Design a protein with these regions (language model features):
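Hydrophobic alpha-helical segments typical of transmembrane helices
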Residues: 9, 61, 81-84, 97
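Terminal low-complexity tails and localization/encapsulation signals of metabolic enzymes
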Residues: 99-112
Length: 112
């Protein structure tokens, strides 16, 4: 929590036990979005569908890099991004994505 909202705000929330309203949690970056009651599953499914439409190798690498970024210095993070780019650009999915873009069609990623 301190990395997301800062040390002072994290201490305030944790030590007071204050409950945040959804809009405040979104405003301070504690949650990425707020949806109306009863619509959380549909909103999550929509995000999952968007992610699933992307190249699985690229998604996996992006997820790994985001997780890594909070634990390493800038130089290490940039080196990891360069290595990941090399891996992603060497995939069949990268070629499929480029071909689909120029053909103005949806890509058919295979995770290779």
């Amino acid at each position: 929590m301190p990395r997301v909202v800062g040390v002072a705000r994290a201490k305030e929330l944790i030590l007071t036990g204050r409950v945040l309203a959804a809009d405040e949690a979104e405003r301070i970056g504690l949650v990425s979005s707020v949806v109306p009651a009863g619509e959380a599953r549909a909103a999550a499914d929509e995000i999952a569908t968007e992610i699933a439409a992307r190249g699985p190798v690229a998604v996996r690498e992006a997820k790994r890099l985001v997780d890594l970024a909070s634990d390493v210095d800038l130089a290490t993070g940039l080196a990891a991004e360069l290595d990941a780019s090399d891996r992603v650009f060497a995939t069949d999915d990268m070629l499929e994505g480029a071909e689909a873009f120029f053909a103005k069609r949806e890509p058919q990623y295979r995770g290779r």
